[in-house]
């Protein structure tokens, strides 16, 4: 007989498995290979639980990626032909060279998904282990993309980073360690404005900025106001969570001439009016930029 706790755990596992299957079947990048992706997902789960060693996978754009069994991001490489396909498809349409800045890059999968569309990329990842893996992924593809093991914020110094173990994507950047029940570590932080000011080689063509820092987005945006004003990237993609103060986000972008959009079901940009639904990626477009579709 199972205890109530064990039964609850099994129900959660079953629910999560069903959700994953639905995502695999519904993902638009899996068209024509959905059954194959289901088999690959099962194979990856078996590999994680038995062999439990890293494996090199080839992405849709022929970049190679080191998939680690303890890395949540790695699963997406097997589940989907194009991980984060909607956002990647839209950004690939916008990009034609230039520089990508990836804030909260994790192991570098997002940067690799755009690697053939940019001239250079600068990655920021506060978790030292994860930053190391990002460097390994760049080296595997002979890319000279920069990986910085530091957090971006609105000030210089140090900040706290949750340590939930392994290479989880859920670690939050915190000003006060008392706001989490997880262990924390101190990590260096700076602002994008200061980083670029001190960089020996100035950026001439900043195309896109992507931000995914688990609720610390507004602080990152505060620290890049000069960058947005002077370098004027066409688009900034950022994750929006329930705990993010969206009115503050709008104010920050509005002050430097950017408007915020979301993607509709047809991958077309719709300007955000009011409070958007949480748990989605939003896009700040330069005021003189004409929205394009992802089709």
Segment roles from a protein language model:
Residues 2-295:
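Phosphate/nucleotide-binding beta-alpha loop and adjacent structural elements of enzyme active sites
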């Amino acid at each position: 007989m199972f205890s109530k706790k064990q039964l609850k755990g099994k129900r959660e596992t079953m629910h999560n498995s069903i959700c994953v299957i639905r995502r695999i079947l519904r993902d638009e990048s899996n068209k024509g290979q959905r059954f194959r992706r289901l088999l690959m997902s099962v194979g990856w789960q078996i590999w994680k639980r038995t062999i439990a060693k890293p494996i090199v996978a080839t992405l849709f754009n022929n970049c190679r990626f080191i998939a680690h069994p303890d890395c949540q991001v790695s699963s997406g490489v097997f589940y989907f032909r194009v991980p984060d396909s909607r956002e990647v498809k839209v950004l690939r349409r916008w990009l034609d060279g230039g520089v990508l800045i990836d804030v909260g890059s994790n192991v570098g999968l997002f940067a690799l998904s755009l690697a053939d569309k940019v001239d250079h990329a600068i990655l920021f990842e506060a978790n030292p282990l994860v930053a190391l893996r990002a460097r390994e992924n760049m080296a595997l593809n002979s890319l000279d993309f920069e990986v910085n093991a530091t957090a971006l914020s609105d000030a210089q110094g140090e900040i706290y980073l949750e340590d939930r173990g392994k290479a989880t994507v859920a670690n939050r950047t915190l000003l006060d360690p008392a706001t989490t029940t997880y262990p924390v570590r101190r990590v260096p932080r700076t602002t994008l404005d200061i980083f670029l000011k001190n960089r020996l080689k100035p950026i001439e063509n900043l195309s896109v900025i992507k931000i995914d820092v688990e609720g610390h987005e507004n602080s990152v945006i505060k620290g890049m106001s000069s960058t947005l004003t002077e370098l004027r990237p066409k688009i900034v993609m950022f994750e929006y969570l329930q705990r993010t103060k969206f009115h503050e986000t709008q104010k920050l972008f509005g002050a430097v001439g950017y408007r915020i959009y979301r993607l509709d079901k047809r991958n077309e940009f719709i300007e955000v009016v009011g409070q958007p639904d949480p748990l989605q990626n939003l896009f700040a477009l330069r005021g003189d930029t004409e929205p394009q579709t992802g089709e």
